[in-house]
Amino acid sequence: MTDILAAFGWVFDPANWAGAGGIPARLGEHAWYSLLTLVLAAVIAVPIGLAIGHTGTFRGLAVGVSGALRAIPTLGLVVYLALITLNLSIIPPLIALTILAIPPVLAGAYSGLESVDRRTIDAARAMGMTELQILFKVEIPLSLPLIIGGIRSAALQVIATWTVAAILPVGGLGRFLFDGLAVQRYDEMLGGSILVIALALVTDGVFAIVQRLVVPRGVTAGKIQDVRSKDPWRPIGPSVPNHPVGNSSM
């Protein structure tokens, strides 16, 4: 308990909020590194995932590659890339963390398109829509919550892993952990960890809100309709009797 109080004392110490190595600067660096990593991963993985989800081809290969990429030890890859390139900038961890972020983004993209009701796609084709129109006007809008969910999962992994990437001389919140360890300032180490957790929670909350906002209203209505009626094609509304109302004796 004393260590936690000391960590919060370090976080709220005004002296730690000034200068190039202060909390705002390190927080901005960490957020920028994470955003850059997510953008690179999305640019690579989302188009591939959309192509796989739309055509249904190479899904098994995508699953296998995603599993293999998840198994790569990220810290080991960061150090390895730094050694073979003799580069101590953000490039080695940026490459390694982009590789880490690709699998969840890829999975979210192709599983999102696979979740779209095939009857909806068949109806779009029957209306004369081209494959590109089906992709951009039907499949992507309906699968957007799952696509955002994949990016959301990748964001949390990236934010956490950029912390250990500070084993190289780069910025970010991980600097507080490694610099604190070097001088045995455990309040600084724990305070840096608290900041990483706070950044991850805020990021997750933002993505959760976005994920809810991109859900099409028709999808929600469709779920209510399925609950109220076993027949998915029966419209919701007042029931109409199957026989005429009146004097049956006439």
Feature map (PLM): residue ranges:
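Periplasmic/extracellular loop-to-transmembrane helix junction in inner-membrane transport proteins
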Residues: 1-38
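Alpha-helical membrane-interface segments at transmembrane helix boundaries
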Residues: 24-32, 66-69, 82, 86, ...
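Loop-to-helix entry region at the N-terminal start of transmembrane alpha-helices
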Residues: 25-33, 82-104, 143-144, 188, ...
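Transmembrane alpha-helices
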Residues: 35, 132-165, 187, 191, ...
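Cytoplasmic-entry segments and transmembrane alpha-helices of multi-pass inner-membrane transporters
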Residues: 48-81, 97, 107-115, 122
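C-terminal transmembrane helix and the adjacent membrane-cytosol boundary/short C-terminal tail
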Residues: 56, 111-114, 118, 190-250
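Glycine-rich helix-loop "coupling/hinge" segments at transmembrane-helix boundaries
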Residues: 66, 83, 161-190, 194-196, ...
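Short cytoplasmic-facing helical segments at TM-TM junctions of multi-pass membrane proteins
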Residues: 108-147, 173, 177
